[in-house]
Amino acid sequence: WAELDGRHWEFDGADVYGEKNWGAEGFPDSWWWGQAQGFSEPDTCVAFAGGQIHSGPLRTEVTALVVRLPDGRVIRLGNPVVSPVRARVADDVWALEGRGYGWRIRVTGRAPLGRAHVLPVPLPSEKRNSAGAIEHLSGELEVEVSRFGRHVWSDHSPQAALEHGGLDRAEAELRRRGVPVGETGAAPE
């Protein structure tokens, strides 16, 4: 249950979403995420997530990529040794390529920066939120899947959610939009 403005709300049987933080301080310097349905085959989907991680002086990037094919097979790539995924991400383009177990998957997501929400993220040690994520809820995504060099599936979805996170990046986008200092989010332009 929750209480807001003196009103009591019950949520018995409701579906909920919980965000997993990336560590004690909440989020890495940069991260990316995306998912899409709405392909021509209704049971297909694509999801990915990645980020820059570090422990002391060690730094690396990791990305996981999961694709459900029209025939129901699910492909999971992202093990840095046997099925690595490379990601080149900007605020309006997500380009991923993964290989492993004979599979090759290419994903390209696109969404105009001005149509993104700027969302807050928590800074636990400071007990406050900060602008942190550039979130597109109406992007597009293309996927190409091959196995041992043979085409398996390719499609396009006009229904992709795409995110590029980073505190400095999100603050810069708020300033570009003319949002006052201290605000932690903004609607699309």
Predicted features, each with a name:
Residues W1-E189:
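Structured soluble/peripheral alpha/beta segments that form catalytic or ligand/cofactor-binding pockets
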